[in-house]
């Protein structure tokens, strides 16, 4: 199942409440402010802080 980009208008980073960006290559939602990535499983974003991965610098 593909990620629906319309969700970007309504989802926010659970840590800072900021906007998220979609990374199609890695299938993740990125918070540039907190420098973390949230996985997307079967088209569903997993917006749990304990599931987020730090971004590579």
UniProtKB/Swiss-Prot annotation:
Instruction: Give the source species.
Output: Shewanella piezotolerans (strain WP3 / JCM 13877)
Tell me which GO cellular component terms the UniProt record holds. Answer: cytosol
Q: Superkingdom of the source?
A: Bacteria
Put simply, this protein is called UPF0434 protein swp_2279
Matches recorded under InterPro entries: Trm112-like (IPR005651)
Q: Of which family is this protein a member?
A: Belongs to the UPF0434 family.
């Amino acid at each position: 199942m593909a990620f629906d980009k319309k969700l970007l208008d309504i989802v926010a980073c659970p840590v800072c409440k900021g906007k998220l960006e979609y990374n199609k290559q890695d299938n993740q939602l990125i918070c540039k402010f907190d420098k973390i990535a949230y996985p997307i499983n079967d088209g569903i974003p997993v917006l749990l802080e304990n599931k987020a991965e730090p971004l590579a610098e």
